[in-house]
Amino acid sequence: MGSAKSAMLILLVAMVIASCATAIDMSVVSYDDNNRLHSVFDAEASLIFESWMVKHGKVYGSVAEKERRLTIFEDNLRFINNRNAENLSYRLGLTGFADLSLHEYKEVCHGADPRPPRNHVFMTSSDRYKTSADDVLPKSVDWRNEGAVTEVKDQGHCRSCWAFSTVGAVEGLNKIVTGELVTLSEQDLINCNKENNGCGGGKLETAYEFIMKNGGLGTDNDYPYKAVNGVCDGRLKENNKNVMIDGYENLPANDESALMKAVAHQPVTAVIDSSSREFQLYESGVFDGSCGTNLNHGVVVVGYGTENGRDYWLVKNSRGITWGEAGYMKMARNIANPRGLCGIAMRASYPLKNSFSTDKSSIA
Protein backbone atom coordinates (compact mmCIF):
# COMPACT_ATOMS: atom_id res chain seq x y z
CA MET A 1 0.00 0.00 0.00
CA GLY A 2 2.85 2.37 0.91
CA SER A 3 4.59 1.77 -2.38
CA ALA A 4 1.32 2.42 -4.22
CA LYS A 5 0.89 5.76 -2.44
CA SER A 6 4.50 6.70 -3.24
CA ALA A 7 3.96 5.84 -6.87
CA MET A 8 0.81 7.92 -6.97
CA LEU A 9 2.64 10.90 -5.37
CA ILE A 10 5.46 10.63 -7.89
CA LEU A 11 2.90 10.52 -10.71
CA LEU A 12 1.19 13.68 -9.45
CA VAL A 13 4.50 15.54 -9.16
CA ALA A 14 5.45 14.43 -12.66
CA MET A 15 2.14 15.70 -13.99
CA VAL A 16 2.73 19.12 -12.40
CA ILE A 17 6.26 19.32 -13.81
CA ALA A 18 5.05 18.24 -17.25
CA SER A 19 2.33 20.85 -17.23
CA CYS A 20 4.90 23.49 -16.25
CA ALA A 21 7.14 22.46 -19.12
CA THR A 22 4.40 23.40 -21.54
CA ALA A 23 4.02 26.75 -19.79
CA ILE A 24 7.68 27.62 -19.82
CA ASP A 25 7.14 29.63 -23.04
CA MET A 26 6.11 32.33 -20.54
CA SER A 27 2.79 33.04 -22.16
CA VAL A 28 -0.11 30.83 -21.09
CA VAL A 29 -1.42 28.46 -18.44
CA SER A 30 -4.27 26.05 -19.17
CA TYR A 31 -7.90 26.81 -18.29
CA ASP A 32 -10.82 24.59 -17.35
CA ASP A 33 -14.17 24.80 -19.12
CA ASN A 34 -15.22 27.79 -17.01
CA ASN A 35 -11.99 29.71 -17.74
CA ARG A 36 -10.88 29.16 -14.15
CA LEU A 37 -7.26 28.36 -13.44
CA HIS A 38 -6.64 24.77 -12.40
CA SER A 39 -5.88 24.04 -8.78
CA VAL A 40 -2.26 23.42 -9.70
CA PHE A 41 -1.79 27.13 -10.57
CA ASP A 42 0.19 27.99 -7.42
CA ALA A 43 2.58 25.07 -7.91
CA GLU A 44 2.99 25.87 -11.59
CA ALA A 45 3.46 29.58 -10.93
CA SER A 46 6.21 28.93 -8.40
CA LEU A 47 8.12 26.69 -10.81
CA ILE A 48 7.60 29.09 -13.70
CA PHE A 49 8.85 31.92 -11.49
CA GLU A 50 12.07 30.01 -10.76
CA SER A 51 12.65 29.41 -14.47
CA TRP A 52 11.82 33.04 -15.24
CA MET A 53 14.36 34.19 -12.63
CA VAL A 54 17.08 32.14 -14.32
CA LYS A 55 16.14 33.41 -17.79
CA HIS A 56 16.28 37.05 -16.70
CA GLY A 57 19.16 36.78 -14.22
CA LYS A 58 17.01 37.84 -11.28
CA VAL A 59 18.47 37.64 -7.77
CA TYR A 60 16.69 39.05 -4.73
CA GLY A 61 18.30 40.33 -1.55
CA SER A 62 16.16 38.37 0.90
CA VAL A 63 13.61 35.60 1.15
CA ALA A 64 10.96 38.18 2.02
CA GLU A 65 11.73 40.19 -1.12
CA LYS A 66 11.60 37.06 -3.27
CA GLU A 67 8.21 36.14 -1.80
CA ARG A 68 6.93 39.64 -2.47
CA ARG A 69 8.11 39.44 -6.06
CA LEU A 70 6.49 36.02 -6.46
CA THR A 71 3.17 37.45 -5.31
CA ILE A 72 3.38 40.23 -7.91
CA PHE A 73 4.53 37.71 -10.52
CA GLU A 74 1.52 35.47 -9.84
CA ASP A 75 -0.83 38.41 -10.18
CA ASN A 76 0.75 39.37 -13.51
CA LEU A 77 0.55 35.75 -14.65
CA ARG A 78 -3.18 35.66 -13.94
CA PHE A 79 -3.61 38.94 -15.80
CA ILE A 80 -1.69 37.56 -18.79
CA ASN A 81 -3.80 34.44 -18.97
CA ASN A 82 -7.06 36.32 -18.60
CA ARG A 83 -6.15 38.75 -21.38
CA ASN A 84 -4.78 36.07 -23.70
CA ALA A 85 -8.02 34.10 -23.30
CA GLU A 86 -9.88 37.00 -24.96
CA ASN A 87 -8.50 36.18 -28.43
CA LEU A 88 -6.97 39.61 -29.01
CA SER A 89 -4.78 40.72 -31.92
CA TYR A 90 -1.78 40.66 -29.57
CA ARG A 91 -0.48 38.44 -26.81
CA LEU A 92 0.97 39.18 -23.42
CA GLY A 93 3.82 37.27 -21.82
CA LEU A 94 6.25 37.16 -18.92
CA THR A 95 8.61 39.95 -19.91
CA GLY A 96 11.48 41.11 -17.74
CA PHE A 97 8.98 43.35 -15.92
CA ALA A 98 6.75 40.50 -14.74
CA ASP A 99 7.91 40.85 -11.11
CA LEU A 100 7.04 44.56 -11.01
CA SER A 101 3.77 46.19 -10.09
CA LEU A 102 2.43 48.66 -12.62
CA HIS A 103 3.51 51.54 -10.36
CA GLU A 104 7.06 50.17 -10.15
CA TYR A 105 7.20 49.64 -13.90
CA LYS A 106 6.23 53.26 -14.50
CA GLU A 107 8.92 54.47 -12.09
CA VAL A 108 11.61 52.47 -13.89
CA CYS A 109 10.64 53.00 -17.51
CA HIS A 110 9.32 56.49 -18.05
CA GLY A 111 12.06 58.96 -18.90
CA ALA A 112 10.83 61.13 -21.78
CA ASP A 113 9.87 64.69 -20.85
CA PRO A 114 7.00 65.76 -23.16
CA ARG A 115 7.31 69.47 -22.40
CA PRO A 116 8.85 71.59 -25.19
CA PRO A 117 12.38 72.87 -24.52
CA ARG A 118 12.47 76.46 -23.33
CA ASN A 119 14.86 77.47 -26.10
CA HIS A 120 14.48 75.77 -29.48
CA VAL A 121 17.80 76.99 -30.85
CA PHE A 122 17.89 74.81 -33.94
CA MET A 123 14.41 73.31 -34.11
CA THR A 124 12.17 74.23 -37.01
CA SER A 125 8.66 73.04 -37.72
CA SER A 126 8.32 71.60 -41.18
CA ASP A 127 5.83 70.36 -43.74
CA ARG A 128 8.59 68.28 -45.35
CA TYR A 129 6.58 65.11 -44.88
CA LYS A 130 3.09 66.54 -45.14
CA THR A 131 1.12 64.29 -47.45
CA SER A 132 -0.50 65.23 -50.74
CA ALA A 133 -2.76 63.53 -53.27
CA ASP A 134 0.26 62.78 -55.46
CA ASP A 135 2.09 60.74 -52.83
CA VAL A 136 2.70 57.07 -53.58
CA LEU A 137 4.13 55.41 -50.48
CA PRO A 138 5.28 51.82 -50.04
CA LYS A 139 2.67 49.52 -48.49
CA SER A 140 5.25 48.43 -45.95
CA VAL A 141 8.64 49.62 -44.72
CA ASP A 142 11.14 47.90 -42.44
CA TRP A 143 14.44 49.73 -42.05
CA ARG A 144 15.97 46.62 -40.48
CA ASN A 145 15.89 45.03 -43.93
CA GLU A 146 17.94 47.96 -45.25
CA GLY A 147 20.60 47.53 -42.57
CA ALA A 148 19.71 50.89 -41.01
CA VAL A 149 18.84 49.66 -37.52
CA THR A 150 21.36 48.60 -34.88
CA GLU A 151 20.73 45.74 -32.48
CA VAL A 152 18.09 46.19 -29.80
CA LYS A 153 19.60 47.76 -26.70
CA ASP A 154 18.58 47.72 -23.04
CA GLN A 155 18.46 50.93 -21.02
CA GLY A 156 18.29 49.00 -17.74
CA HIS A 157 17.08 50.86 -14.66
CA CYS A 158 18.23 54.21 -16.07
CA ARG A 159 15.37 56.39 -17.33
CA SER A 160 17.27 57.15 -20.53
CA CYS A 161 14.72 56.29 -23.22
CA TRP A 162 15.10 59.87 -24.50
CA ALA A 163 18.74 59.12 -25.35
CA PHE A 164 18.06 55.72 -26.92
CA SER A 165 15.28 57.01 -29.17
CA THR A 166 17.37 59.97 -30.34
CA VAL A 167 20.43 57.82 -30.95
CA GLY A 168 18.38 55.22 -32.85
CA ALA A 169 17.07 57.80 -35.30
CA VAL A 170 20.55 59.26 -35.84
CA GLU A 171 22.05 55.79 -36.39
CA GLY A 172 19.43 55.07 -39.05
CA LEU A 173 19.82 58.35 -40.89
CA ASN A 174 23.61 58.09 -40.82
CA LYS A 175 23.38 54.68 -42.50
CA ILE A 176 20.97 56.00 -45.15
CA VAL A 177 23.21 58.97 -45.99
CA THR A 178 26.69 57.46 -45.65
CA GLY A 179 26.09 53.75 -46.19
CA GLU A 180 27.72 52.96 -42.84
CA LEU A 181 25.82 51.63 -39.82
CA VAL A 182 27.58 52.85 -36.68
CA THR A 183 26.42 51.95 -33.17
CA LEU A 184 26.41 55.26 -31.31
CA SER A 185 26.72 56.18 -27.65
CA GLU A 186 23.75 56.90 -25.41
CA GLN A 187 26.20 57.38 -22.53
CA ASP A 188 27.68 60.37 -24.36
CA LEU A 189 24.28 62.06 -24.08
CA ILE A 190 23.65 60.92 -20.50
CA ASN A 191 26.98 62.23 -19.22
CA CYS A 192 27.46 65.33 -21.34
CA ASN A 193 24.04 66.69 -22.31
CA LYS A 194 23.62 68.81 -19.17
CA GLU A 195 20.37 70.39 -20.35
CA ASN A 196 18.81 66.97 -19.90
CA ASN A 197 18.81 64.94 -16.70
CA GLY A 198 20.62 61.74 -17.63
CA CYS A 199 19.00 58.78 -15.89
CA GLY A 200 16.40 61.18 -14.52
CA GLY A 201 14.85 61.71 -17.95
CA GLY A 202 15.13 64.20 -20.78
CA LYS A 203 13.78 65.81 -23.93
CA LEU A 204 14.47 64.41 -27.38
CA GLU A 205 14.72 67.87 -28.97
CA THR A 206 17.36 68.91 -26.44
CA ALA A 207 19.33 65.78 -27.28
CA TYR A 208 19.28 66.63 -30.99
CA GLU A 209 20.49 70.16 -30.22
CA PHE A 210 23.33 68.79 -28.10
CA ILE A 211 24.52 66.55 -30.94
CA MET A 212 24.57 69.53 -33.30
CA LYS A 213 26.39 71.90 -30.94
CA ASN A 214 28.96 69.51 -29.48
CA GLY A 215 30.75 67.78 -32.32
CA GLY A 216 28.36 64.92 -32.91
CA LEU A 217 27.98 61.63 -31.06
CA GLY A 218 30.75 59.23 -30.15
CA THR A 219 30.48 55.52 -30.82
CA ASP A 220 29.36 52.96 -28.29
CA ASN A 221 32.78 51.31 -28.49
CA ASP A 222 34.50 54.55 -27.51
CA TYR A 223 31.90 55.63 -24.95
CA PRO A 224 30.09 52.45 -23.76
CA TYR A 225 26.77 52.42 -21.95
CA LYS A 226 26.84 52.21 -18.13
CA ALA A 227 23.16 52.81 -17.24
CA VAL A 228 24.15 55.38 -14.59
CA ASN A 229 24.91 59.08 -14.60
CA GLY A 230 28.60 59.77 -15.07
CA VAL A 231 31.12 62.55 -15.51
CA CYS A 232 31.45 63.90 -19.04
CA ASP A 233 34.83 62.85 -20.44
CA GLY A 234 35.59 64.55 -23.74
CA ARG A 235 38.76 62.50 -24.12
CA LEU A 236 36.61 59.50 -25.02
CA LYS A 237 35.69 61.31 -28.23
CA GLU A 238 39.11 62.74 -29.07
CA ASN A 239 40.63 61.50 -32.34
CA ASN A 240 37.64 59.26 -32.93
CA LYS A 241 35.07 59.52 -35.67
CA ASN A 242 31.91 61.10 -34.34
CA VAL A 243 28.62 61.07 -36.22
CA MET A 244 27.07 64.49 -36.76
CA ILE A 245 23.70 65.81 -37.89
CA ASP A 246 22.76 69.07 -39.58
CA GLY A 247 19.46 69.67 -37.83
CA TYR A 248 16.17 68.17 -36.81
CA GLU A 249 12.48 68.84 -37.36
CA ASN A 250 9.20 68.03 -35.71
CA LEU A 251 6.44 66.38 -37.69
CA PRO A 252 3.01 68.01 -37.82
CA ALA A 253 1.21 66.92 -34.65
CA ASN A 254 -1.63 64.41 -34.74
CA ASP A 255 -1.03 63.36 -38.35
CA GLU A 256 -0.42 59.64 -38.89
CA SER A 257 -0.20 60.18 -42.65
CA ALA A 258 2.75 62.55 -42.20
CA LEU A 259 4.35 60.07 -39.81
CA MET A 260 3.95 57.32 -42.40
CA LYS A 261 5.57 59.45 -45.09
CA ALA A 262 8.47 60.31 -42.79
CA VAL A 263 9.05 56.68 -41.81
CA ALA A 264 9.10 55.77 -45.50
CA HIS A 265 12.20 57.99 -45.73
CA GLN A 266 13.96 57.39 -42.40
CA PRO A 267 13.55 56.10 -38.83
CA VAL A 268 11.66 58.61 -36.68
CA THR A 269 11.62 59.28 -32.94
CA ALA A 270 8.29 59.37 -31.14
CA VAL A 271 7.18 59.94 -27.57
CA ILE A 272 4.34 57.66 -26.49
CA ASP A 273 2.32 56.67 -23.45
CA SER A 274 3.67 53.28 -22.36
CA SER A 275 2.08 53.28 -18.91
CA SER A 276 -0.41 50.43 -19.31
CA ARG A 277 -0.07 46.95 -17.90
CA GLU A 278 -0.58 45.54 -21.39
CA PHE A 279 2.41 47.51 -22.65
CA GLN A 280 4.48 46.30 -19.69
CA LEU A 281 3.75 42.66 -20.56
CA TYR A 282 3.49 42.86 -24.37
CA GLU A 283 4.86 39.80 -26.16
CA SER A 284 3.70 39.72 -29.78
CA GLY A 285 1.09 40.67 -32.36
CA VAL A 286 -0.49 43.98 -33.35
CA PHE A 287 -1.00 45.89 -30.12
CA ASP A 288 -4.24 47.85 -29.84
CA GLY A 289 -4.60 47.57 -26.09
CA SER A 290 -5.08 50.02 -23.30
CA CYS A 291 -3.02 53.21 -23.32
CA GLY A 292 -3.62 56.93 -23.13
CA THR A 293 -1.85 60.03 -24.42
CA ASN A 294 0.16 60.97 -21.33
CA LEU A 295 3.47 61.00 -23.21
CA ASN A 296 6.31 59.52 -21.16
CA HIS A 297 8.49 57.14 -23.19
CA GLY A 298 10.76 57.67 -26.20
CA VAL A 299 10.93 55.05 -28.97
CA VAL A 300 12.04 54.79 -32.60
CA VAL A 301 9.55 54.08 -35.38
CA VAL A 302 11.53 51.97 -37.85
CA GLY A 303 8.77 50.82 -40.18
CA TYR A 304 5.13 50.08 -40.81
CA GLY A 305 3.05 47.36 -42.41
CA THR A 306 -0.05 45.19 -42.19
CA GLU A 307 -0.50 41.86 -40.41
CA ASN A 308 -3.66 39.78 -40.68
CA GLY A 309 -5.49 42.80 -42.05
CA ARG A 310 -4.36 45.10 -39.22
CA ASP A 311 -2.15 48.10 -39.99
CA TYR A 312 0.74 48.67 -37.59
CA TRP A 313 3.76 50.79 -36.76
CA LEU A 314 7.01 48.89 -36.20
CA VAL A 315 8.44 50.36 -33.00
CA LYS A 316 11.92 49.71 -31.62
CA ASN A 317 12.03 49.83 -27.83
CA SER A 318 15.07 50.00 -25.54
CA ARG A 319 14.12 47.24 -23.11
CA GLY A 320 16.24 44.39 -24.48
CA ILE A 321 15.26 41.43 -26.64
CA THR A 322 13.16 39.65 -23.99
CA TRP A 323 10.41 42.28 -24.23
CA GLY A 324 7.98 42.16 -27.15
CA GLU A 325 8.94 40.64 -30.48
CA ALA A 326 12.68 40.48 -29.81
CA GLY A 327 12.59 44.08 -28.57
CA TYR A 328 10.02 45.44 -31.04
CA MET A 329 6.31 46.22 -30.89
CA LYS A 330 3.76 46.26 -33.69
CA MET A 331 1.50 49.13 -32.64
CA ALA A 332 -1.91 49.61 -34.30
CA ARG A 333 -1.86 52.23 -37.08
CA ASN A 334 -4.68 54.22 -38.67
CA ILE A 335 -6.93 54.22 -35.63
CA ALA A 336 -9.86 56.60 -35.18
CA ASN A 337 -7.97 58.92 -32.82
CA PRO A 338 -5.81 61.42 -34.82
CA ARG A 339 -3.24 61.35 -32.02
CA GLY A 340 -2.51 57.73 -32.85
CA LEU A 341 -2.44 54.79 -30.47
CA CYS A 342 -0.65 55.75 -27.26
CA GLY A 343 -0.16 59.23 -28.75
CA ILE A 344 2.41 58.04 -31.28
CA ALA A 345 1.56 60.87 -33.73
CA MET A 346 1.59 63.66 -31.15
CA ARG A 347 5.32 64.30 -30.71
CA ALA A 348 7.38 62.77 -33.51
CA SER A 349 10.64 64.19 -34.83
CA TYR A 350 13.55 63.27 -37.04
CA PRO A 351 17.19 64.33 -37.58
CA LEU A 352 18.58 65.91 -40.75
CA LYS A 353 21.89 65.03 -42.35
CA ASN A 354 22.95 66.28 -45.76
CA SER A 355 26.35 64.66 -46.13
CA PHE A 356 28.98 62.47 -44.51
CA SER A 357 30.62 64.50 -41.78
CA THR A 358 32.82 63.82 -38.77
CA ASP A 359 34.37 65.91 -36.08
CA LYS A 360 37.43 65.00 -34.04
CA SER A 361 37.11 67.73 -31.46
CA SER A 362 36.25 66.87 -27.88
CA ILE A 363 33.64 68.40 -25.64
CA ALA A 364 34.35 70.07 -22.35
UniProtKB/Swiss-Prot annotation:
PANTHER family: CYSTEINE PROTEASE FAMILY C1-RELATED. It is an enzyme of class 3 (hydrolase). Belongs to the peptidase C1 family. The keyword Plastid does not apply. Disulfide bonds join 158-199, 192-232, 291-342. The active site is at residues 161, 297, 317. SUPFAM superfamilies: Cysteine proteinases. Residues 1-23 form the signal peptide. Probable thiol protease. The keyword Cell membrane does not apply. One of its GO terms (biological process) is proteolysis. It comes from Arabidopsis thaliana. This is Probable cysteine protease RDL4. One of its GO terms (molecular function) is cysteine-type peptidase activity. Pfam families: Inhibitor_I29, Peptidase_C1. Keywords: Disulfide bond, Glycoprotein, Hydrolase, Protease, Signal, Thiol protease, Zymogen.
